[in-house]
Amino acid sequence: MAKNWQDPAFAEAWDARHVVGNPARAEHLSLLLTILEEVASGWILDLGCGSGLIAQMVLDGKAGARILGLDSSAAMLEIAKERLGPYDERVQLTEADLTSLDRVKAPTECSAAIAVQSLHHLDETQYRAAVRWTFEHLAPRGWFFIIDRLAIPAERLYSAFHNLRERQGQSPNPADWSGYLEWLEVNGDRPLPVQGILRLLEEAGFQSTALDVRGDRGMLIGRRPG
């Protein structure tokens, strides 16, 4: 069954188990918070903020940070509003689809942007537009952090990825290539390969690199020159 992000029950269940089956995410988030300590204070865009878990971590770890959280799920945003209420004017939450960011009013000199497990729902054209919009809303030397699912590039490589996912305790872990493709389709996931994401970042004007890649999970970073 496809993920129903508009269903309050599904949103609550996801919020309760957001790192289950993804052992790389906790370490990537820890690394994100460490790097953000060196980032200038100011607005941080949270693309696909969901239930506000990442925003809360950032606000707790960086006193000068303000978060503009964007998400298309009203159910997720309701959880985020409750979670982030105590932070008052440091948080602004907006219901917005990542496929139509040009409709969003956002600061144009943000110090950073983060996208955690959100961009893999976009096709390549939509992904390119989201990256370019993000670039345009960052201050010179602003950072873009992407923590997300990555495409497994070819069927003949799948068994190696399957074994790694099994060792890491990732779930679900389809046994074969056809099962993997079916799982992606059912969930509406369209992950891009590392090289594809880096290409989109460079096209937009970012200096970029894959900071940490573990099979089909990775942390990629881009920085606007300035």
Model-assigned labels for residue ranges:
Residues 204-226:
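Core SAM-dependent methyltransferase catalytic element
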Residues 147-204:
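C-terminal alpha-helical "lid/dimerization" subdomain adjacent to the S-adenosyl-L-methionine
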Residues 100-107:
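Short conserved loop adjoining the S-adenosyl-L-methionine
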Residues 114:
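A conserved beta-strand element that flanks and buttresses the S-adenosyl-L-methionine
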Residues 128-140:
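A short glycine-rich, Lys/Arg-flanked "PGG" loop and its adjoining helix->strand segment in the class I
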